[in-house]
Amino acid sequence: MTDFIPTTDLSDAQPQAQVAAPVLRDFGGRTRFQGAAVTLRISENNPLVRQTLQTPGAGRVLVVDGGGSLNCALLGGNLGVFGVENGWEGVIIHGCVRDTAELRELDLGIRALAAHPRRSGKLEEGERDVPVTFAGVTIRPGDHVVADEDGWLVLGAESP
């Protein structure tokens, strides 16, 4: 893993970095995380999140475009445990999470819009490894995502 460089330093040194709007909250036990993006586009159904977190993360970050839905949670404690067990660095969700007390105890970076007690649907639909856009940034599979106490940003796949 590359040494961690804070988002403030990256933003100053790399003006091409896409800095995300500060609309996501921190829910994970790890505040600082980084890695290559794996992307999903889903709508109020989380089987693709489960399937992805059950595969080796190899230090990557799962980026989920849930359409900004505030109707249900796309990640909870059980799926968070899969992320830790399989070596994921973090999960960024344009949607909601639940089981927030459990998520806070996990060694996993987690950003999401809000907490919601309702679970998602279980239809296996959505897209994987597609560009996703939310919070004012576009994330492509393989882009380098960096998150810390000051926010999160996206660098091209060739960046550290």
UniProtKB/Swiss-Prot annotation:
Keywords recorded for this protein, A-Z: Lyase, Metal-binding
Free-text cofactor note: Divalent metal cation.
Classification via CDD domains: RraA_family
Substrates-to-products reaction catalysed: 4-hydroxy-4-methyl-2-oxoglutarate = 2 pyruvate; oxaloacetate + H(+) = pyruvate + CO2
NADP recorded as keyword: no
Source organism, top-level taxon: Bacteria
Matches recorded under SUPFAM superfamilies: RraA-like
The enzyme's E.C. designation: 4.1.3.17, 4.1.1.112
Pfam family, one: RraA-like
Binding site for substrate: 76-79, 98
Enzymatic class: lyase
Gene Ontology molecular-function annotations: 4-hydroxy-4-methyl-2-oxoglutarate aldolase activity; metal ion binding; oxaloacetate decarboxylase activity; ribonuclease inhibitor activity
Binding site for a divalent metal cation: 99
Cofactors required: a divalent metal cation
GO biological process entries: regulation of RNA metabolic process
Coiled coil feature spans: none
PANTHER family the UniProt entry points to: 4-HYDROXY-4-METHYL-2-OXOGLUTARATE ALDOLASE 3-RELATED
Assembly and interaction partners: Homotrimer.
Similarity comment text for this entry: Belongs to the class II aldolase/RraA-like family.
Role summary: Catalyzes the aldol cleavage of 4-hydroxy-4-methyl-2-oxoglutarate (HMG) into 2 molecules of pyruvate. Also contains a secondary oxaloacetate (OAA) decarboxylase activity due to the common pyruvate enolate transition state formed following C-C bond cleavage in the retro-aldol and decarboxylation reactions.
Name this protein carries in UniProt: Putative 4-hydroxy-4-methyl-2-oxoglutarate aldolase
